[in-house]
From Swiss-Prot:
HAMAP family: LepA. It holds the Pfam family EFG_III. The keyword Magnesium does not apply. Its EC number is 3.6.5.n1. Residues 4-186 form the tr-type G domain. It comes from Ehrlichia ruminantium (strain Gardel). Its main location: membrane. GTP binds at residues 16-21, 133-136. One of its GO terms (biological process) is positive regulation of translation. It is a peripheral membrane protein. Gene3D superfamilies: 3.30.70.240, Elongation factor 4, C-terminal domain, Elongation Factor G (Translational Gtpase), domain 3, P-loop containing nucleotide triphosphate hydrolases, Translation factors. This is Elongation factor 4.
Length: 598
């Protein structure tokens, strides 16, 4: 295939601006699927993507398009996620392409994630074509959005394409712009094979499947290939492309995107961003690869049935292959048994992984409250990274604690600016910058990550009636006043209920948790004391009263000492029961007790 006729492009946008719908129309226009096979969000293969109306995994498809000049072009389309938690998927997709369609909702205008994604495309040296979607709606304002693109993003929007992905208006113009305005891939067919590993997933029959982009040379069936980071060698069994159906081909050459299978069983051999080359004729230098992504939110996941531990381990391994951005390690809890401490890119990422575990692997799970990574510096100068309250250590040995901060970009209509700034200030935020484009404010704030990851996104959407948008990136660590809050039930610490809290909120948090546990734990035959403590200091307490049996009911008249004797006997029995009895805490109590209330 002549690389001059290949175009590799990604579709990038803020969440809900119509990326997946535009992808559907492009596939339809190029006859990628027959009419009877077409459905909404055709590239969103997971049920959870369809139900939530979001893209989670970047997807690829090859289309054939006969342009007005009579030439046949091969278009490799990458549909990318729009939510901030999945921005890593966007970065990987952009590395495989030369150009991007920047889709902007012409009724909403530029939003925070639009900015973040377009800057990633600019960093990847992409040619960018602005596409203004939803022009058939009465509230559409293309001229205003064009000026926003030029003012806020700084790219020329005079040749923006006006489309309605839902009704199909302007789709041919998009295809013509792709072939005329986006560059063909560079690279040399005669050079040794050099391909970048873009994604991996697990297939029950084929083992590990690799999605790759060929940069130089050619990859053929039967060829011996090498993963340059691990030096692992495999023989290629199958080569294919997505149309969007899987289609087996003989080879992939310069500029092409497709998948290979090679009976790979070792997960560690397939690192996202690795360079693949031919064993007999290796390329000189590997590709720079992708930036290593680190989880920022951690929580523990436990199977409700002890016998499901191994099934959970296998499920996590398979999901990690398809999503290298989340991590897991074994954890043992005295309250919940054996489970895993898992790391995620954000709260939506956590919810999606937990939901996939329960749906795809039929597991019944309990997840503890999420937390972030703190840096603890001991008095002898040793730095430890801690995301689990159990690893906090002795307070006496700690010199200082640092917590992660982020830089948030918030775009909000000016009538909601006051309430949004008030929320940021309540979350210990520091204002960095405020600018305007028309009646839209562009707000930059520095905030502690622990205040943002839980419900900040939902709160921003709620107080702005859905009009505000948020994007954020890590901005280093800062010294902070942090304390470990321990919850005791009948003087016994419960590890699953421990959490790390800022000292300004520790008393309020302790009282909240104790009050919730009082409602959640069923009454027993003896008194239950629920306490919140920081170190050895008790800062909050609630008591669950026992059931009371009237042991004196059978008495009538007689000596008062008989009555006292029976009550004393009951008291001794309850004391003995409390000493040997375990308080049964329901599974859902752990999550409900740790939920944040403002």
């Amino acid at each position: 295939m002549d690389k001059i006729n290949i175009r590799n492009f990604a579709i990038i946008a803020h969440i809900d601006h119509g990326k997946s719908t535009l992808a559907d129309r492009l596939i339809e226009e190029c006859n990628g699927l027959e009419k009877r096979e077409m459905k909404d969000q055709v590239l969103d293969s997971m049920d959870i993507e369809r139900e939530r109306g979001i893209t989670i995994k970047a997807q690829t498809v090859r289309l054939m398009y006969t342009a007005k000049d009579g030439k046949v072009y091969y278009l490799n389309l990458m549909d990318t996620p729009g939510h901030v938690d999945f921005s890593y998927e966007v970065s990987r997709s952009l590395a495989a392409c030369e150009g991007s369609l920047l889709v902007v909702d012409s009724t909403q205008g530029v939003e925070a994630q639009t900015l973040a994604n377009v800057y990633k495309a600019i960093d990847s040296n992409h040619e960018i074509i602005p596409v203004l979607n939803k022009i058939d709606l009465a509230s559409s304002d293309p001229d205003k959005v064009k000026s926003q693109i030029e003012e806020i993003i700084g790219i020329d929007a005079s040749e923006s394409l006006l489309v309605s992905a839902k009704s199909g208006i302007g789709i041919k113009d998009v295809l013509e712009a792709i072939v005329s305005r986006l560059p063909a891939p560079s690279g040399n067919f005669d050079n040794p094979l050099k391909a970048i590993l873009v994604d991996t997933w697990y297939d029950t029959y084929l083992g590990i499947v690799i999605l790759l982009r060929v940069v130089d040379g050619v990859i053929k069936k039967g060829m011996k290939i090498v993963m340059m980071s691990s030096n692992a060698a495999y023989q290629v069994d199958n080569i294919g492309i997505f149309t969007p159906h899987k289609k087996i081909v003989d080879q992939l050459s310069v500029g092409e995107i497709g998948f290979i299978t090679a009976s790979i069983k070792e997960l560690s051999d397939c690192k996202i961003g690795d360079t693949i080359t031919e064993e007999q004729r290796r390329c000189d230098n590997p590709m720079p690869g992708f930036r290593t992504i680190h989880p920022v939110v951690f929580c523990s996941i436990f199977p409700n049935e002890a016998g499901d531990f191994e099934r959970l381990r296998e499920a996590l391994k398979k999901l990690q292959l398809n999503d290298a951005s989340f991590t897991f390690d074994i954890e043992v809890s005295s309250a919940l048994g054996y489970g895993f401490r898992c790391g995620f890119l954000g709260m939506l990422h956590l919810e999606v992984i937990q939901e996939r575990l329960e749906r795809e692997f039929n597991l019944d799970l309990t997840a503890t409250a999420p937390g972030v990574v703190y840096q603890i510096i001991s008095k002898n100068g040793i730095l430890r990274e801690v995301h689990n309250p159990h690893d906090f250590g002795d307070v006496q040995d700690i010199a200082s604690i640092k917590e992660p901060w982020i830089c948030a970009t918030i775009m909000v209509p000016d009538q909601y600016l006051g309430v949004v700034m008030s929320l940021c200030n309540n979350k210990r935020g520091e204002k960095v910058d405020l600018s305007y484009s028309g009646n839209t404010a562009l707000l930059k704030y520095r905030l502690p990550l622990s205040e943002v990851v839980f419900d900040f996104y939902d709160r921003i959407k709620s107080i702005s009636k859905g009009y505000a948008s948020l994007d954020w990136e890590m901005d280093g660590y800062m010294d902070s006043e942090i304390a470990k809050l321990t919850i005791l039930i009948n003087s016994e610490p419960v590890d699953a209920l421990a959490c790390i809290v800022h000292k300004s909120k520790v008393e309020q948090r302790g009282r909240e948790i104790c009050l919730r546990l009082k409602d959640l734990i069923p009454r027993q035959q003896y008194k239950i004391a629920i306490q919140a403590a920081v170190g050895s200091k008790i800062i909050a307490r609630e008591t669950i009263s026992p059931y009371r049996k009237d042991v004196t009911a059978k008495l009538y008249g007689g000596d008062v000492t008989r009555r006292m004797k029976l009550l004393e006997k009951q008291k001794k029995g309850k004391k003995r029961l409390r000493a040997i009895g375990n308080v049964n805490v329901p599974h859902n109590a752990f999550i409900q007790a740790l939920k944040i209330i403002d």
